[in-house]
Amino acid sequence: MARSLKKGPYVDLHLLKKVDAARASNDKRPIKTWSRRSTILPDFIGLTIAVHNGRTHVPVFISDNMVGHKLGEFSLTRTFKGHLADKKAKKK
C-alpha cells in the first residue's frame, strides 16, 4: 500500500541532517545509516549512503533513477546461493 500524497515522503530526521551537513561541507565520504525505511529525495543525488543490511553497511551511490524509492531496496539482506543442480542430469 502506497503512502498518502498529502503526508509526503518519509525521511528520518537524523539522516536528513547528515545529508545537509555533507552537502554544506562538500564531503564525499559515505554517510552511514541504519534507516532502510527512508525515501530517497532529490537532495541525495550524487551522494554515497552506506545502508545497513543487518551485517554490514553496503555503499549505495544515489542516482536520479533512485528518487522516490526506499534506501533498503538497494541493500539486499539475503544471500542467494543458487539452486542445486539436478542429480539425474549430472549422471548422464
UniProtKB/Swiss-Prot annotation:
SUPFAM superfamilies linked to this entry: Ribosomal protein S19
UniProt entry keywords in alphabetical sequence: Ribonucleoprotein, Ribosomal protein, RNA-binding, rRNA-binding
InterPro entries for this protein: Ribosomal_uS19, Ribosomal_uS19_bac-type, Ribosomal_uS19_CS, Ribosomal_uS19_SF
Membrane-crossing residue ranges in chain numbering: none
GO biological process, one term: ribosomal small subunit assembly
Pfam entry (one): Ribosomal_S19
Disulfide pattern: none
GO molecular function: rRNA binding; structural constituent of ribosome
GO cellular component, one term: small ribosomal subunit
Family classification: Belongs to the universal ribosomal protein uS19 family.
Its job: Protein S19 forms a complex with S13 that binds strongly to the 16S ribosomal RNA.
Protein name: Small ribosomal subunit protein uS19
Organism: Neisseria meningitidis serogroup B (strain ATCC BAA-335 / MC58)
